């Protein structure tokens, strides 16, 4: 079952926008939570936000369903949904005020990919012109391979107006600090000289409504199962925006229908940033609470016995997927409360475990038309593989026995053969916010 998620639930988007509009931080710029007038161009613009449910059969008695949020071939990530709504809000602000907008997004990769695609899409469809809407992205160096070629890179004028900055430092999360500094130090100056608002776009509310639509789709797809069975929503996470948004939508549906939706949550992370799982299990982000690994010299693997962490790994601090770079996310505490109230758990996976399960996952995903390459070195986005590895391990280890149905949120998967990587000659390497201002 495939739908255009935003177009299908435009009425719900408007209702949810009104609800969270009062939460906007008035001390920093952000467009109102309001869409432009709906016309054929906007419907075409939103049509990229496709989603699909696909039954994958069962695994050890658990029904497995994929919620595929990666249907936009230009991004192959769930961030498309929120990015389209954000750009639509920007267009609405431009139309109402005459001001231009520069969207600024520090990102580990996928937010930048999706927002750049949404801006490019708006320009191509003619919803706005290249002077009115621009995008500035800042990514860590380890994520450069994720960024795609588009008209924003191949057209010289658009490339100049929509620069890609790359942070050369070792701490990927530092792009957020640089982003905050840039906004604080230069947004006023940019507005005064060019009538352009800088929109620092990382606020969770920018993603909340798009992610809430998952709950409406789920309610439509599983109408008879909502009360009869326990449903677990599994997601590879950095800050768990997707699951928090789903829960926001779920609560709205419960209020509207007076029905209880019995869904719990499974957080899946990698060792480098397993902060949410640590905090869920132990109430702390301290890595001192990590299980103690012992090197098995006969295999070269580090091993331990805590079922919530990799039983075997090549690296006890492994960065499996550069998408996940956030330490000590503020969202962790709200997610803990949701899991305490609804059930669920958290699990950390390793590359070794992903590879160990890759054949099984390849077969599971065939009904969804998702092809895992034989040469796994071609994979440039591991979120989906991590999610399925986490689900398989959780079932095998008895972590999620109380749930009957498992919905895996497919948030990102692509290989190097799916797209043309950006030419590195057009990237701007920076070390601080001072290096960025000359580009805008």
Language model regions located:
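PLP-dependent amino-acid enzyme catalytic core
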Residues: 1-440
């Amino acid at each position: 079952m495939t739908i255009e998620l935003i177009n299908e639930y435009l009425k719900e988007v408007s209702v949810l926008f009104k609800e969270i509009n009062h939460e906007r931080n008035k001390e920093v710029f952000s467009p109102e939570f309001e869409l432009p007038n709906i016309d054929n161009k906007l419907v075409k613009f939103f049509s990229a936000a496709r989603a699909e449910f696909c039954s994958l059969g069962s695994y050890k008695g658990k029904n497995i369903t994929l919620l595929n949020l990666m249907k936009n071939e230009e991004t192959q990530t769930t961030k498309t949904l929120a990015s389209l709504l954000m750009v639509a809000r920007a267009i609405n602000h431009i139309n109402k005020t005459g001001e231009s907008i520069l969207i600024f997004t520090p990102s580990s990769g996928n937010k930048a990919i999706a927002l750049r695609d949404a801006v490019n899409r708006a320009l191509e469809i003619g919803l706005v012109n290249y002077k009115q809407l621009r995008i500035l992205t800042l990514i860590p160096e380890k994520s450069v391979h994720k960024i795609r070629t588009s008209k924003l890179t191949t057209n010289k004028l658009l490339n100049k107006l929509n620069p890609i900055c790359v942070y050369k430092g070792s701490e990927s999360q530092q792009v957020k600090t640089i982003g905050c500094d840039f906004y604080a130090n230069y947004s006023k100056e940019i507005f005064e000289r060019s009538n352009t608002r800088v929109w620092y776009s990382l606020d969770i509310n920018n993603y909340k409504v798009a992610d809430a639509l998952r709950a409406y789709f789920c309610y439509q797809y599983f109408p008879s199962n909502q009360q009869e069975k326990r449903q677990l929503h599994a997601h590879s996470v950095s800050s768990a925006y997707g699951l928090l948004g789903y829960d926001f939508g779920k609560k709205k549906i419960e209020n509207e229908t007076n029905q209880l939706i019995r869904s719990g949550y499974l957080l899946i992370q990698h060792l480098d940033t397993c902060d949410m799982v640590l905090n869920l299990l132990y109430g702390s982000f301290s890595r001192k609470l990590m299980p103690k690994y012992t090197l098995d010299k006969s295999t070269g693997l580090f091993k331990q016995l805590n079922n919530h962490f990799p039983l075997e790994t090549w690296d006890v601090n492994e960065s499996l997927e550069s998408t996940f770079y956030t330490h000590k996310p503020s969202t962790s505490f709200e997610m803990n409360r949701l899991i305490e109230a609804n059930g669920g758990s958290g699990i950390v996976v390793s590359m070794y475990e992903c590879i160990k399960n890759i054949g099984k996952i390849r077969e599971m995903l065939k009904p969804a038309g998702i092809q895992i390459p034989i040469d796994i070195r071609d994979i440039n986005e591991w979120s989906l593989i991590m999610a399925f590895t986490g689900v398989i391990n959780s079932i095998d280890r008895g972590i999620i026995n109380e749930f009957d149905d498992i919905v895996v949120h497919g948030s990102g998967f692509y290989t190097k053969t799916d797209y043309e990587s950006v030419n590195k000659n057009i990237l701007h390497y920076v070390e601080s916010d001072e290096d960025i201002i000359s580009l805008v």
